[in-house]
Amino acid sequence: MLYYLLQYINELFDPPGFGVIEYITFRASAAAITSLLITILAGPKLIGYLKSKYIEPVKEEAPPEHRQKRKELPTMGGTLIIFSVVVSGLLWAKFNDPYVWLILLSILWMGTIGFIDDYRKVVLKIKGGLSAKYKLIGQVSLGLFIGFYTRFDPAFSVLLTETTIPFFKDLMIDYGWWYIPVVVFIITAVSNAVNLTDGLDGLAAGTSGIVVFGLGGFAYLTGNAVYSEYLNIAFIPGGGEVAVVSMAIVMACVGFLWFNSHPAEIFMGDTGSLALGSAIAVIALLIKKELLLPVLAGTFLLETLSVSLQVTWFKFTKWRFGEGRRIFLMAPLHHHYQMKGWAEEKIVIRFWIITLLFFLASLMTLKLR
């Protein structure tokens, strides 16, 4: 919106300095600042409203100390993240870029699924909220839409069903008709992974912010013909606009941490975690970096694997020995360390550090090929 207004003023009057609106870096920075300010300024009012309406029920399987600390805190804070990102994205990104719309759509789509889940748990007092079946339907539906749209719309003709492989130079893989199932799988897997990670104050917001920052950097490089040629990575015309929305997401997460850092005043709930997870997946798919996610988003992978291993081992040992046994004290992984007596703040910061290391490892793929 502001992009087109400032562009019109620049073409009409040619005032000094207005040409900067054409630069991705300027608009990404502006979107970041706008998103941060919206989150911080709107946060207190939203928290006050949610405190009077929506208090998150604590999971019964959570550690006792964790349950005690989390009583009487509002959820659905993800609405703040979504609002900040959508407003900032619409203000500073180009309307005619389909990449922008698909990212914003995915955030709103999965944010709505998460909101319904939170609403059923908090307001309707339905234990478990939205059933796993309907969550899966929502995730698969989004995946099918994104898959078919990017597969058959001419705007996405570059590479189409091909993608790059990390650590290998000039090596591409063509999904062919497997492309759409791959899109569905990645969106479902990543949104669930972020949802599993959202269990401690600041954990999901911090790790998501780091991952999206990395994706935003890759988006900027893939959308720049000079940088992409120099680094020998896929060039995607118009993909640079993804960086604008990415920075809005990053700073929405940072702004949310203002209220969600320990001791938290609000939780993002499934509204936020599912929205962030879908955004990460869609951004990675659009810039052809989905195969880099196991490295860049390694923290989410570890959290998901801890749950999968725990459940699988428990079922196997129950079948084999007559009683279920556990690998971890509790899953996901962050609760394992909680049960070991680690302070919540220490777990969160260490997971942030691990995510930063994964981010640096992903940067190394630009040269280690």
Swiss-Prot record:
Q: Which cofactor does it need?
A: Mg(2+)
- GO MF, one example: UDP-N-acetylmuramoyl-L-alanyl-D-glutamyl-meso-2,6-diaminopimelyl-D-alanyl-D-alanine:undecaprenyl-phosphate transferase activity
Q: Which residues cross the membrane?
A: 30-50, 73-93, 99-119, 140-160, 171-191, 202-222, 239-259, 266-286, 291-311, 346-366
What EC number(s) is this enzyme filed under? 2.7.8.13
Show the catalytic activity: UDP-N-acetyl-alpha-D-muramoyl-L-alanyl-gamma-D-glutamyl-meso-2,6-diaminopimeloyl-D-alanyl-D-alanine + di-trans,octa-cis-undecaprenyl phosphate = di-trans,octa-cis-undecaprenyl diphospho-N-acetyl-alpha-D-muramoyl-L-alanyl-D-glutamyl-meso-2,6-diaminopimeloyl-D-alanyl-D-alanine + UMP
Q: Which Pfam families match?
A: Glycos_transf_4 (PF00953)
Q: What GO CC annotations are associated with the protein?
A: plasma membrane
> What keywords sit in the KW lines?
Cell cycle, Cell division, Cell inner membrane, Cell membrane, Cell shape, Cell wall biogenesis/degradation, Magnesium, Membrane, Metal-binding, Peptidoglycan synthesis, Transferase, Transmembrane, Transmembrane helix
* Compartments in which it is found: Cell inner membrane
EC category name: transferase
Write down the InterPro entries for this protein, in alphabetical order.
Glycosyl_transferase_4, PNAcMuramoyl-5peptid_Trfase, PNAcMuramoyl-5peptid_Trfase_CS
- Specify where it is mainly localized: membrane
Q: PANTHER family annotated for this entry?
A: PHOSPHO-N-ACETYLMURAMOYL-PENTAPEPTIDE-TRANSFERASE, PHOSPHO-N-ACETYLMURAMOYL-PENTAPEPTIDE-TRANSFERASE HOMOLOG
Give the family from UniProt. Belongs to the glycosyltransferase 4 family. MraY subfamily.
Q: What does this protein do?
A: Catalyzes the initial step of the lipid cycle reactions in the biosynthesis of the cell wall peptidoglycan: transfers peptidoglycan precursor phospho-MurNAc-pentapeptide from UDP-MurNAc-pentapeptide onto the lipid carrier undecaprenyl phosphate, yielding undecaprenyl-pyrophosphoryl-MurNAc-pentapeptide, known as lipid I.
Protein name as it appears in the record: Phospho-N-acetylmuramoyl-pentapeptide-transferase
Native source organism of the sequence: Chlorobium phaeobacteroides (strain BS1)
